Amino acid sequence: MDRFIIRGGRRLTGEIEIGGAKNSGLKLMVAGLLTSERLVLSNVPAIADIKTMRDLLVGLGITVEDAGPRTLSIGGEIGSVEAPYDIVSKMRASILVLGPLLARAREAKVSLPGGCAIGTRPVDMHLKGLETLGAEIRLENGYINATAPDGLKGDRIILPFASVGATENLLMAATLAKGRTHIVNAAREPEISDLVHCLNAMGAQITGEGSGTLVIDGVEKLHGAHYAVMPDRIECGTYACAAGITGGDLLLVGGRADDLGAVIRTLEETGVEVLEEERGLRVRRSGTLQGVDIMTEPYPGFPTDMQAQFMAMLSVAEGASMITETIFENRFMHVPELNRMGARVNVHGRSAIIRGVPKLSGAPVMATDLRASFSLILAGLAAEGETQLSRIYHLDRGYEGVDRKLAACGADIARVSD
């Protein structure tokens, strides 16, 4: 099993290219289920979750071909409607094949999902929304069995929470439903807009992205398209924290300020400067990090996927900070590992109090989920001495070439195999 060895204390300078968004690329691949024609996606990140989604689509009878560097061609007839446990258990996003299978094949059998061990992440909203569109759903032996023998029918769906996954599943299902569908309290994340733009390029009729209410006029069929996956705003924010925690100066090539409003505002409150340039975002820090209070919220609020990275940075900031997690349960699993490195973090329910310390110390630590993995890398970059990070397969799910990108900017980091 691979691990990272990090020797901290080096200031990062240089350029890092931001790849395609994991949280968009996965959903755009699933959109390929909605047509027999070819959906050609470019700027697809080379990460483990993309490979898992590829395996899932192939298992459903869809052909997925390499069509160039970071480019996939997806399409074909659906040969199976079962998404099995051995694949779905690896990745939470697998649940998103449910809506497209129902819309196009009128039936689906999808294992209840796995993925990161972050709270319960219930799928109730997905299922209730699909039932509103006319699906019949039964939960049996760990599987979701869904049918819509007469096809899905447009209706009004009000989500009790602006769930990203439920919005995406219902949005894709509604593109082939009969009539008009309203999704009220829809998620507003940039990745939702990316999915809307891709679906519209395939012939869907969707309006309202970013407004909180999506309006979908169903069509009989979708066609193929060429589409580029948006840059990964979470990867961009993560490397911005790397510049912040090391007092560095990084140009994040391809980074877009429009996707990172709350993150940029919070970085600036801590004393990290973010400048828009022609090729991306320049992030640098010359002064002292300052403590701030953060509350995670649905977009356009502060993203839960950036919480762990900011905690690492705030652990060496002046003063006290508080992070309140409102999206997921159990998303402070990185706290004991940070504390092993000398951080002073106490968890009280959904809030974590961080009292900044002058320095962290290298230690053996273990990753617990995707974003927590990178928070420990950040801590290792700032720590005195050597940090060994194990279970980095979590990291490989969502970040491409971490050691290569960081080393090119001056980090002392190496991947080793046991």
Swiss-Prot record:
The modification 2-(S-cysteinyl)pyruvic acid O-phosphothioketal is found at residue 116. Keywords: Cell cycle, Cell division, Cell shape, Cell wall biogenesis/degradation, Cytoplasm, Peptidoglycan synthesis, Pyruvate, Transferase. This is UDP-N-acetylglucosamine 1-carboxyvinyltransferase. It is an enzyme of class 2 (transferase). One of its GO terms (biological process) is peptidoglycan biosynthetic process. HAMAP family: MurA. It catalyses: phosphoenolpyruvate + UDP-N-acetyl-alpha-D-glucosamine = UDP-N-acetyl-3-O-(1-carboxyvinyl)-alpha-D-glucosamine + phosphate. GO terms for cellular component: cytoplasm. UDP-N-acetyl-alpha-D-glucosamine binds at residues 92, 305, 327. It comes from Gluconobacter oxydans (strain 621H) (Gluconobacter suboxydans). It holds the Pfam family EPSP_synthase. Belongs to the EPSP synthase family. MurA subfamily. The lineage of its organism: Bacteria, Pseudomonadati, Pseudomonadota, Alphaproteobacteria, Acetobacterales. It is found in: Cytoplasm. SUPFAM superfamilies: EPT/RTPC-like. It comes from the Bacteria. Pathway: Cell wall biogenesis; peptidoglycan biosynthesis. InterPro entries: Enolpyruvate_Tfrase_dom (IPR001986), Enolpyruvate_Tfrase_sf (IPR036968), MurA_subfamily (IPR050068), RNA3'P_cycl/enolpyr_Trfase_a/b (IPR013792), UDP_GlcNAc_COvinyl_MurA (IPR005750). The gene is murA. Cell wall formation. Adds enolpyruvyl to UDP-N-acetylglucosamine. Phosphoenolpyruvate binds at residues 22-23.
